[in-house]
Regions:
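Conserved kinase catalytic-core helix
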Residues: 101-132, 148, 178-190
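Short, low-complexity, polar/charged sequence segments that are solvent-exposed and flexible
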Residues: 50-55, 107-113, 167-172
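Conserved ATP-binding subdomain of kinase catalytic cores across diverse folds
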Residues: 1-102, 115-126, 137, 143-146, ...
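General "foldedness" signal
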Residues: 45-47, 72-79, 105, 130, ...
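C-terminal catalytic region of ATP-dependent kinase domains
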Residues: 142, 146-223
């Protein structure tokens, strides 16, 4: 996949742990861009998970690599270092969406809930939490059409991933028994995960030799 050149940096966003940047690319679309602040490991995790998630039919917004020109970064002043003049990960900005709330749980298709739960367990992503007390599900909701959008995978492939914590805090943890303890449901999920594996190799192969976030591809280590 060829990287799109960023033609305008609009602002730094307030949402998100790493506060990504809203940018306009050469295709005139708006993207949420993550750069150096996300860390090279996090950027690679985003890239790999976006491919794997799409292969599993998860509703992940269109994504791309973004080339950020040095002159645009310099114009940001001190904040420019958080983005960096390098290759960034871009997720297309979606309109008409809001942060996912626990009240919307019942509106999410049960098959999609289980598919996402299996995916997050598979890629060791514990960063999708939500309960009555709050949390950070890294999900968006489009009320028109009851559509879920899945975002933010920079903390996947976590070396300190703890299954017990994951199953206690995941936004869709209520589906864990029906998914993992039912032979038919788990066999179906496992087959889907297995079928998605080729997209992992495709994602690796499509990363530029120059790297994402300035780290050469040969140095990527996720596990």
């Amino acid at each position: 996949m060829s990287a799109l050149r960023v033609v305008e940096i609009l602002r730094r966003m307030e949402q998100g742990r790493t506060r990504p940047f809203l940018v306009r690319a050469e295709d005139d679309a708006l993207y949420v861009a993550k750069g150096r602040e996300t860390t090279q490991r996090g950027l690679v995790a985003e890239w790999l998970c976006a491919h794997l998630g799409r292969a599993l039919d998860l509703p992940i917004p269109p994504f791309t690599l973004l080339e950020v020109p040095a002159e645009l970064v310099a114009a940001l002043g001190a904040e420019g270092g958080a983005l960096g003049a390098s290759t960034a990960f871009g997720s297309r900005l979606e309109s008409g969406v809001q942060d996912f709330a626990i009240a919307q749980l019942r509106n999410v298709d049960v098959a999609l809930r289980r598919r996402l739960l299996a995916f997050d367990w598979w890629v060791e992503n514990a960063d999708r939490t939500l309960s009555e007390l709050g949390g950070n599900p890294n999900l968006l909701w489009r009320a028109a059409g009851d559509a879920l959008l899945v975002i933010d995978h920079n903390l996947a492939f976590d070396r300190e991933f703890d299954e017990s914590t994951f199953f206690a805090t995941h936004v869709f943890h209520g589906d864990a028994s029906a998914l993992f303890e039912d032979w038919i449901n788990w066999t179906d999920a496992a087959n889907r995960l297995r079928a998605a594996l080729p997209s992992f190799d495709e994602a690796l192969a499509s990363m530029p030799d120059s790297g994402i976030g300035s780290t050469p591809r040969r140095r990527y280590r996720l596990v």
